[in-house]
Amino acid sequence: MSSSAQNEIVACHLGRVSYERARALQERVQERLIAAKRAEPPEPEPHVLLLLEHPPVYTLGKSGDAANLLVSEERLEEVGATFHRIGRGGDVTFHGPGQLVGYPLFDLDRFFTDLGRYLRTLEEAIIRTCADYGVTGTRVDGRTGVWVGPDDRGPERKICAMGVRCSRWVTMHGFALNVTTDLDYFDHIVPCGIDDRGVTSLAAETDAPGTVDDVCGPVTEHFGALFDAEVTTRHGDDARSFLRGLTGERVEAPGR
């Protein structure tokens, strides 16, 4: 067993990727991690953290209520968005430009086999990232994700949504941190099925939110620290080449 692969996370900073392509990538990496742990002897692959942006898309989790999508799918097409029903936990949410989406493909057998602890660790990575930008992120009892407030700006509001799926302790799906997101897109849904709280972004909470690319750095650093793992970061074409070699899936560069 390779000790380097045992505790290595490859963070792939990909830029903008379609939801369909990112989902296919997740499935292929998850399949590869599961196959590696079934091998005799096990041959652990590195864990993978996909960091990217999506074009406008709404997703509904397997336990979600379609009534929380407040407009028709035809109306979403009119505003340039798509809609997908998917297998993660959680309700309806939005992904789009200005939002950092993170998909950890981790074999929790090599960290800890506790899904609640895993979610709290994801939250902690985002709380620490928010703090890097002068924003105090918090948890809310009974609700997954990272929140801001209540404070003089208003009541509790969600800055980062989370929803995960796990198969044989290998994770997929993950988190969506609003950086400079156009929050008007959330007017078309009841975000995460919670109708008594709003949403926010780093840009709404601070004068210096950075860009999505900027925020990838601290997120990657905090993942390495919290999972006690060695992190290798790959950007752009290097990340796409790595993933194509790993999965056979082609990842188009933004704008191509």
Swiss-Prot record:
Keyword Acyltransferase annotated: yes
GO cellular component, as recorded: cytoplasm
Record carries keyword Acyltransferase: yes
Entry EC no(s): 2.3.1.181
Catalytic residue positions: 192
BPL/LPL catalytic domain residues: 43-231
Record localization: Cytoplasm
Keywords: Acyltransferase, Cytoplasm, Transferase
Protein role: Catalyzes the transfer of endogenously produced octanoic acid from octanoyl-acyl-carrier-protein onto the lipoyl domains of lipoate-dependent enzymes. Lipoyl-ACP can also act as a substrate although octanoyl-ACP is likely to be the physiological substrate.
The name this protein goes by in its record: Octanoyltransferase
Organism: Salinibacter ruber (strain DSM 13855 / M31)
Lineage: Bacteria, Pseudomonadati, Rhodothermota, Rhodothermia, Rhodothermales
